[in-house]
Amino acid sequence: MSKHPGSKILYERALRLFARGVTHDARYFKPMPIYCIKAKGSKKWDVDGNEYIDYWMGHGALILGHAHPIVTEAAVEQARRGTHLGASHELEIEWAEKVRRLLPCARNGYVEFTSSGTEATLMALRLSRAYTGKQKIIKFLSHFHGWQDYTIIDYNQDFSHILEGAYPPGIPDGTLQSVIALPPNDIESVEETIANEDVACVILEPGGASMGYLPTYKPFLEKLRKITRENDVILIFDEVVTGFRDAPGGAQERYGVIPDLSTLGKILGGGYPGGAIAGRRDIMGLLDFRDEEGWELRRIRHPGTFNANPLSAAAGNACLGLILKGEVHPRINHAGERFRRALNDVFEDIRIDGLAWGTTDSIVYVGFGFSEEDLKVEDIEGYVEFQRKKAMNKEPIEYLDKAMINRGIHPMGARFILSIMHRDEDLQYTIECFEDSLKELKREGIISEFAD
């Protein structure tokens, strides 16, 4: 508290204005969140002048780091020209052309811009139902697709409540009845459900639940692709996180599994708001204007004040242009791999039962009491056990976050999200602070050494 008097004052003001005191659930933090005023590269600074190496990176949107000069210049130049032209513009075409060049499922398809990833997933679900004429949606437990009604039914809820059939309030019964939530990576449950239900689509995070916290693996994706194709079920990859991060073409490029539709966000906008759906022409064609009798009764409408907003398009073009040069991913993946290995070495050296992991090299998770086997969830029993261990991590991870923040490191809960601006010295200092923080937690009895 003594290092953050300015944040304390701002939080007290915020509590009078916002019901939850913050503007995003993930930013809620006890005793208060930190309030930042500027950021550059891998660093950010709070209102009290404290400097942090940042591992939130705009919730994963900033693969190029904060205020990248090329992206910033593009956005500033467009702001001078106008932030909303109320008309079509060339930047939206260039932006879509880059998405097409990068994303395998879009290369012979269409792109449709939205204002957020949540909007993109909503549109993908609607397109799937309209195209197939079927009603049911399969999603996987703990996979996040925005806060919209269809896919929020289980996310961040007590898993025992979900298994007992208790859902978040405010979601209509009809919506709940149209969604089938299955255990992650359980291909047998998928086969059985598709055989017995009116399934329009399957949606998932291809890198795994919650930004890859609970991993998905290539063999499952390959089987899922085969089953959905054989049964005329639309496969949707939610690549809001993995798009342009796992590889230039996202998880679908990395795993070699091409979905029918993909949803995008975060990196797409270069740090500015934006989302998109991309994929098959016959499905996306439902958005088209046609002079066919009765077409207007079948057509999917898509208004949106900030669709392909020029400011986001300018920043997104600049960001994707740098990714297309091919220099971003070798650099960030190499750094992430070394960073993950180093964190695991720390766990081993100071005898703490912990694990660092990640399905993409540039997002690294840490947890206590996890093993590699715990990450291989393929049925409801494995999922329940994984969630039990995750629940046990809540308190020690909160203490770890506080210890790291007080040392000038800002992790995003249990995850470290890297950018190309994280230098070797940033990572080395983070590793040292991680070790010091673990030792502090061990001294205070929050975590303990593993037994021989």
Regions found by a protein language model. Give the residues of each.
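Conserved N-terminal phosphate-binding loop of PLP-dependent enzymes in the Aspartate aminotransferase
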Residues: M1-D452
